[in-house]
A protein has these predicted regions:
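Histidine-acidic metal/acid-base catalytic patches
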Residues: 1-2, 9-21, 143-162, 168-255
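Short histidine/acidic/glycine/proline-rich micro-motifs that form metal-
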Residues: 32-36, 63-65, 102-103, 139-141, ...
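N-terminal pre-domain/capping segments
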Residues: 1-89, 247-255
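Acidic (Asp/Glu)-rich catalytic clusters
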Residues: 17-23, 39-58, 83-92, 125-129, ...
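A generic structural signal for short
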Residues: 4-6, 33-34, 72-73, 111-112, ...
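Hydrophobic faces of well-ordered beta-strands that scaffold small-molecule active sites
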Residues: 3-7, 28-30, 56-60, 96-98, ...
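Conserved radical SAM core fold
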Residues: 62-66, 102-105, 193-199
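Active-site acidic/histidine proton-transfer and metal-coordination neighborhood
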Residues: 51, 67-160, 170, 240-241
Length: 255
């Protein structure tokens, strides 16, 4: 099991990565989004990763309307995702996250899952050409339940599941149901706490997620991959203290 942290896109991606390396994390969950992380100079980033022996996973902008049913919009989003894929691949990533697309005309709302399936196929194919596996993240309805993901995984060959435990705490199906029914499809994980009313991104143990059960259920699937501590705080010093407490708690529970 590897524990990593996501960069804050409002700060320098290079300074963030150096800070993660100095703090002893295993990998960077590199999100490519504005305002400060819209582009990444791989020639500048690669030696930083090597210096601190950091691996990397890819995280994409959650606001891209990649399944919107207008060909030009889909193509523009595919081009942007391919730009991200080139960066992730060059930096040694094997996983590339994508968020469900909720953008569609109101009269087509009932077709939202089908629109996502249709648009995911070329995205997964593109990512595969760069040696990347696309991991779709669970989030708001209807992408908050196992039944939707079973359909997606069946109809989109090569797709995998990015299980966000904080999101699952707010959704129709919690982490236990996802792990028990789709455990073998999980390729990446996000851990953060909340009180089920919003995506608070709290340190582990602060909200109402049962972390003993969460870790035990995840381990029972045989998962031993990357876990991102997605804990947010405006104060950088406090953020790393919260992250360190969360890491220690996770390591204790994982034993």
């Amino acid at each position: 099991m590897k524990i990593g942290v996501m960069n804050n896109p409002a700060k320098s991606v290079y300074e963030e990565t150096i800070a993660f390396g100095k703090a002893g994390y295993d990998f960077v969950d590199l999100t490519i989004e504005g305002p400060q992380a819209r582009d990444v100079d791989t020639a500048k980033m690669e030696p930083i990763l090597k210096r601190y022996n950091l691996a990397l996973t890819g995280h994409t902008d959650p606001c891209l309307p990649w399944a919107y049913p207008v060909p030009g919009i889909r193509q523009a989003c595919l081009d942007e995702l391919e730009r991200c894929a080139r960066i992730f691949s060059a930096l040694g990533a094997g996983i590339m996250n994508i968020h469900p697309c909720y953008f569609c005309p109101p009269a087509m709302r009932a077709l939202l899952v089908e629109l996502n399936i249709e648009a995911l196929k070329p995205i997964v194919e593109m990512a595969s050409s760069y040696g990347l596996t696309i991991a779709l993240e669970n989030f708001k309805p209807p992408f908050d339940r196992v039944s939707t993901f079973k359909t997606l995984l069946k109809k989109v060959a090569g797709l995998s599941l990015h299980l966000d435990f904080g999101h699952a705490n707010m959704g129709q199906n919690n982490h236990a149901i996802f792990c028990k029914q789709l455990g073998t499809a999980i390729t990446h994980v996000h851990f953060s706490d909340n009180r089920a009313t919003a995506d608070h991104h709290m340190p582990l143990g602060v909200g109402n997620i049962d972390w003993k059960n969460a870790v035990a259920t995840l381990k029972a699937t045989g998962y031993d991959g990357t876990i991102t501590l997605e804990v947010f705080c405006d104060d950088s010093q406090m953020r790393f203290q919260y992250l360190d407490l969360s890491r220690k708690y996770l390591l204790e529970l994982w034993q």
